[in-house]
Amino acid sequence: MATKVYIVYYSMYGHVEKLAQEIRKGAASVDGVEAILWQVPETLQEDVLSKMSAPPKSDAPIITPNELAEADGFIFGFPTRFGMMAAQFKAFLDATGGLWRTQQLAGKPAGIFYSTGSQGGGQETTALTAITQLVHHGMIFVPIGYTFGAGMFEMENVKGGSPYGAGTFAGDGSRQPTELELGQAFHQGKYIAAISKKLKGPAAA
């Protein structure tokens, strides 16, 4: 049976979604892994999103809390809001009380990726505060550390991401993830998928 890795994300302007798509490619490159993209539900009304000039959502399916139980590993992605995950993703996690009660996510590996508006805009604080959500579910946080190699030490150009996970800077919204940031995202997907497969054990395809 294939190891299921869910890439679950919230993206308002598409920056996190671009990272998510690359992460899925990386996870799917691991033999025996089924990598699936999911969006969490939007909490803002359409008229509000329109006033914020938010583009239409992609066709990635909307996940429900109970569907998390079907996965063997996770990579969660979200934009930063004042140094923490966006409220839309927090609202989704707040609805996982039933899974917490039955401990259906305990022992499962999970990684984190993110987007901020600027350097120093909360990439590491967003990751740090998100870890508390994993801890209460008994999940295993899987950082990428410095496994991305030389790409972690890029100094000539602006680059998002950290040992906590892949990331990008959106700026005023016009900046898009760079090739290096997308490369780190692909690496994260591949890295966490391989660990998820290993933790699942011999039952994995």
UniProtKB/Swiss-Prot annotation:
Binding-site residues, NAD(+): 13
Domain Flavodoxin-like: 5-192
Pfam assignment, any one: FMN_red
Cross-referenced InterPro entries: Flavodoxin/NO_synth, Flavoprotein-like_sf, Flavoprotein_WrbA-like, FMN_Rdtase-like_dom
Co-factor: note: Binds 1 FMN per monomer.
Entry's localization field: Cell membrane
Family: Belongs to the WrbA family.
Protein's recorded name: Probable NAD(P)H dehydrogenase (quinone) FQR1-like 1
